[in-house]
């Protein structure tokens, strides 16, 4: 008696059914530069007009163990937003406009409804970012993942005029450091967060915590902010006064802000200049987790940092506000001399 691919654990019909659903989800994300529909061997996207020296900008990332929260809660339609955010926000830091996005979804046994929910989130993230979902890969890998689990990876490409690339080289001592609010943990630090909440505090994802304003799962699954519209507004309002942008991800402020600062420069930040979101307070008390560990693990409520000329700080904050983002003066750029990377962010 013959053996089939389905009996070996790969259901081609389920994969085809998911592709048809993905086509419908991707269609509303299409931009004028896209030249082909989802479903071919390759996605096609033309460079936008009006650029004399267009430079392509790429970024790739995943969602990490935030996926464990999706598995535990059965909520799968937000981690796709996180996936787009993690890739697109990196591309945005050099001043690029996001063009297109591709995803990789891998699972042991394909559940078409779960796959559709994940891609629905990806499509929503692409809409927020103004980029097109032009393709991806769905891999059914029997025996590679536990039942009901999957992994995600994403890849974003944007474009920027060569002369408008933000590389941080013009940052100078005295420049203002503008903090832009995160929505919570975003997509980093979840291994520590889950350890504190589940092991140290004995909570489940369905438990309600007054300080969180809902369940543990709801607080943790809050989607990562996508700053595409905000950065477009910032650049329009402030132009060359924008000196650099930093996406605050794993490593927190000390691990990310120095990546855009020239040698010899650091930043003095005032963490008392804003209200730290409740989720971080719950985690710090619940561990307990030392402040230094909090700073190098979580974004602490700051999802993006913009470095601008001091005189442009008010304009920058206003531009962020008009695009729906909360922003404030978090600190300033200072001279620090020859110090280790991790010591270039000072907290005062």
From Swiss-Prot:
One of its GO terms (biological process) is 'de novo' IMP biosynthetic process. The keyword Magnesium does not apply. Pathway: Purine metabolism; IMP biosynthesis via de novo pathway; 5-amino-1-(5-phospho-D-ribosyl)imidazole from N(2)-formyl-N(1)-(5-phospho-D-ribosyl)glycinamide: step 2/2. GO terms for cellular component: cytosol. Keywords: ATP-binding, Cytoplasm, Ligase, Nucleotide-binding, Purine biosynthesis. It comes from the Bacteria. Its EC number is 6.3.3.1. GO terms for molecular function: ATP binding; phosphoribosylamine-glycine ligase activity; phosphoribosylformylglycinamidine cyclo-ligase activity. InterPro entries: PurM-like_C_dom, PurM-like_C_sf, PurM-like_N, PurM-like_N_sf, PurM_cligase. It is found in: Cytoplasm. It is an enzyme of class 6 (ligase). Its main location: cytoplasm. It catalyses: 2-formamido-N(1)-(5-O-phospho-beta-D-ribosyl)acetamidine + ATP = 5-amino-1-(5-phospho-beta-D-ribosyl)imidazole + ADP + phosphate + H(+). It holds the Pfam family AIRS_C. PANTHER family: TRIFUNCTIONAL PURINE BIOSYNTHETIC PROTEIN ADENOSINE-3 (PTHR10520:SF12), TRIFUNCTIONAL PURINE BIOSYNTHETIC PROTEIN ADENOSINE-3-RELATED (PTHR10520). Belongs to the AIR synthase family. This is Phosphoribosylformylglycinamidine cyclo-ligase. It comes from Sorangium cellulosum (strain So ce56) (Polyangium cellulosum (strain So ce56)).
